[in-house]
Amino acid sequence: MFDLEKFWDSFNAEMRSEFNEVSYNAWFKNTKPVSFNKDTHELVISVQTPVAKGYWEQNISANLIQSAYAYAGIDIYPVFVVKNGPTPSSERMLEPQPQAKPEKARPQGREFTKDLRLNEKYTFENFIQGEGNKLAAGAALAVADNPGTFYNPLFIFGGVGLGKTHLMQAIGHQMLAERPDAKVVYIQSETFVNDFINSIKNKTQDKFREKYRTADLLLVDDIQFFAKKEGIQEEFFHTFETLYNDQKQIVMTSDRLPTEIPDLSERLVSRFAWGLQVEITPPDLETRIAILRKKAESEGLEIDESTLDYVASQVDTNIRELEGALVKVQAQATIQKQDINIGLARSALADLKLVQKSRGLQISKIQEVVANYFQTSVPDLKGKKRVRQIVIPRQIAMYLSRELTDASLPKIGQEFGGKDHTTVMHACDKIARQIKTDTEIKSAVSDLRQMLER
């Protein structure tokens, strides 16, 4: 029998040993189990805010699933619900609140930000939210509203051209709008590297440290370029420590998680996990249409919805390429002196690799083949039934989707009835283990792989 109260006490004790006190209080103190369904194994958990919900789904859910399996030998399905309460902008999220420290003396006005290079278009007002970025956007708004308190550091990761820099700079714009004398430092990681090297050559290390360690908000883009640079990592570690201890906000972006950056020191990996690590994934069709609509409005273009829909359906990789496709359509319309319509868009984008032709193996195909192999149905694979004859095929289908396509974990979860990415991760890990110990599972996976790779 699964004793929810005892399990929760055990899980909390485990997490308390893995998180520092500030992080533990932030993520666990006000999070409570609500109910456990013994038939579906659904565990409902109450969290304080939408961002906390996203953090649990992305960062803690896998630990919760593994702990439940170790505790009771069962697979649970966590469901996170937001408790009614104040929004992040009005609540005081940490208990106890850190005591304000005296401000270090510094010149007033814009002296510190005169060299800042923020793109004036990268504001929250211009950011289009969708399923792939709503958690990151919510976290960025919370950080802009309460810098240095809760999601510190904020680590945004994802592919090229998905809006990481936009969100990061939006935080900077909002801080400067509210505090014109704030010291906001925005840099590419390569700039930090070059500044550090030059400070050694010119013996100006004190000036270098003054620049970075007295910031109110430090924004570091593409931090993966710190990979394999031990001296740079050492310097950034001390910069991080100084800012964090002074309760100053740190925001970083990367194309991957800290744990996936080659030779990134363990202490940096650990500190980057103190706050919130949040992924941005490629926009879905609805979001892509909204992005194009916003772009068309800003450029004064008259484009009907069907044409926007067509252009959006041709590019599903990133926002940069999506907007590039619209620019190409606009250019052809200008050259040919024609109105923009589907026919013109089709002609302008004819040399693009249409997404339908470039995706390769589809998750839907994997689901169909797996369902036929196990004599079940695709709706069952996407559903919530917990009987073994459906659970195992579902987990194998998720595993093969991960192995044979380039779909992200959240994307795979979406294709399996909207399951969160930690459920997919658990399924993939479980099948990977069983392949080594269970000849029946190994044989089934091998058969299916051969069928799908023909």
UniProtKB/Swiss-Prot annotation:
Keywords: ATP-binding, Cytoplasm, DNA replication, DNA-binding, Lipid-binding, Nucleotide-binding. This is Chromosomal replication initiator protein DnaA. The gene is dnaA. HAMAP family: DnaA_bact. ATP binds at residues 161, 163-165. The lineage of its organism: Bacteria, Bacillati, Bacillota, Bacilli, Lactobacillales. Residues 88-112 are annotated as: Disordered. Residues 101-112 have a biased composition (Basic and acidic residues). GO terms for cellular component: cytoplasm; plasma membrane. Residues 117-333 are annotated as: Domain III, AAA+ region. Residues 1-74 are annotated as: Domain I, interacts with DnaA modulators. Domain I is involved in oligomerization and binding regulators, domain II is flexibile and of varying length in different bacteria, domain III forms the AAA+ region, while domain IV binds dsDNA. Disulfide bonds: none annotated. Pfam families: Bac_DnaA, Bac_DnaA_C, DnaA_N. GO terms for biological process: DNA replication initiation; regulation of DNA replication. Residues 334-454 are annotated as: Domain IV, binds dsDNA. It is found in: Cytoplasm. GO terms for molecular function: ATP binding; ATP hydrolysis activity; DNA replication origin binding; lipid binding.
